[in-house]
């Protein structure tokens, strides 16, 4: 993929932050492209890797998070995951639990090589579907000392069980598997992949409110970007199939490092975060088939519910009127994120 050097984000560049494009490889040999943000006043040795939402690009919400945290002294890298945006990998618009988790670990690898970064003080932020991926990465890699999952989805659960677990039956999963198998056969015969479509457009009048919220972010000037799958033609029709038959948060009850899960009070996705938090602490929660031991280090785990906020309000803070107009609602608790990371990245003692 060709990389643009022009500023093409959906938000303006902060005057207090320096920015440059970077590239690094994951263990599968895929080149990932990121935006590195650095405070002009000098960093504090702490670094954050940021990704999400699922199907978005670094020019959207993850870039905003990265830039805002750089304003607060962190070296940050917002990156496009494999098969997405400016990063490499074929076929395009494909997702994989293992490769996506590896993408986060590769970003940690990259940050640990920078002279201005203390390799023992690295954290991650995952937004939407990448919130769940961030938890999986934290369960795998103890180099990650602090994790924020913002407005998270559990992509395995939603692909396997449907929204609100309404398709959690063998019959429903079998029907979905048959449909996906037919798509694969057709793709094999034709030699072409069919894109499944991003956020629905035109928007039906009777669409659920959360779909309207997605439309307002991805399809209008508020958050539209030409490289974003959600803003355009989406994943290919079986591009997320690998998530439907996996359960990748099995070991989050063993995360010893600090975790903050934050959700809007009115988010349709709130149950993903609340159930993940409970399972992470207790080893038992709705949506999780296993019953496991309680977390060995529960004291550094937090759940934050933001009053009045929707799912997409935590993408960019939200606005009082559609299309990013009106007054900014400022729903993202930047001070809380700064306090959480500085507290937990300053304490580098192994838990």
PLM features: residue spans?
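N-terminal cap/lid segment of alpha/beta-hydrolase-fold proteins
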Residues: 2-42, 324-327
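The serine-hydrolase catalytic nucleophile loop
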Residues: 55-67, 81, 273
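Catalytic nucleophile-loop/oxyanion-hole region of alpha/beta-hydrolase
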Residues: 57-58, 84-119, 322-333
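Conserved alpha/beta-hydrolase
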Residues: 68-88
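Alpha/beta-hydrolase fold nucleophile elbow
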Residues: 116-128
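Alpha/beta-hydrolase-fold enzymes
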Residues: 135-220
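Short beta-strand/loop motif that positions the catalytic acidic residue
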Residues: 255, 261-263
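Catalytic active-site module of serine/aspartate enzymes centered on a nucleophile-bearing elbow/loop
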Residues: 309, 318-351
